[in-house]
Amino acid sequence: LLSGMVNECNLDPIPTSVNKKSDLCVSPKMIDTKKLKVAVSYDLGFAPMSKLCKDTFDKKLNKINNFFHSVKFAHPEMINADKTFYLLRGIGFVNDFSEINNNNPGSLGSVIVDELKRASSISIKDIGWAMSEHTKIYRNAEHFFEEYDLLITPAASVPPFKHEEEYPKEIDGIEMENYLKWEAISYGVTLFGGPAIVIPCGNIDGKMPFGIQLISRKNSDINLLDVAYSLEQKFKGNSDLELI
């Protein structure tokens, strides 16, 4: 939702259009969700997702399908999202933390130091590939949102877990290759360049909160807030959809 909070600035080397600030002075409003053509996906074609979250997502879809004009399983093509994201993230880590690590060894946490070590192996060829692939994924998303108004996924790959557990080491018996992988359903959509928002959608397994992730095209931040607000209002009073 960043484009809903920033102004244009000539100091930005890669300027982009932003929302009018007057839009932010207005409270979210109810819209007719029956006009929305919606795509849904368990995993965007690449993200790990537990069976429990898939099954819960199915149950929620059965309850909300009639809120929309149409609902179809679909997502933008992004088979190389993992590699693209990790490479671009690595470049950012080198820029943000390498000087600190060099000047003050031991001042950074082990996770950041490990990321810097991995990033040090990135080549110019890797960077070129990642930038090219990011452009492909971004354009795939733009074309996708010409057909659909909204993309909905589960908000997380696993139910809430204990605070003492650093991150899920495995999902349904499949080992996660790193500490980020379980968050793929969230970091994948950052490659679209558009807004995403998570709203509560009842409970999972009758116990903990369950959320759905709403994603839309670039520069549709204000509209997405209206969609999220409208769905939250529709969920009220429904024990299967309202957070209890």
Question: Model-derived features: where do they sit?
Answer:
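Short amphipathic alpha-helices in soluble, non-transmembrane regions
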Residues: 227-231
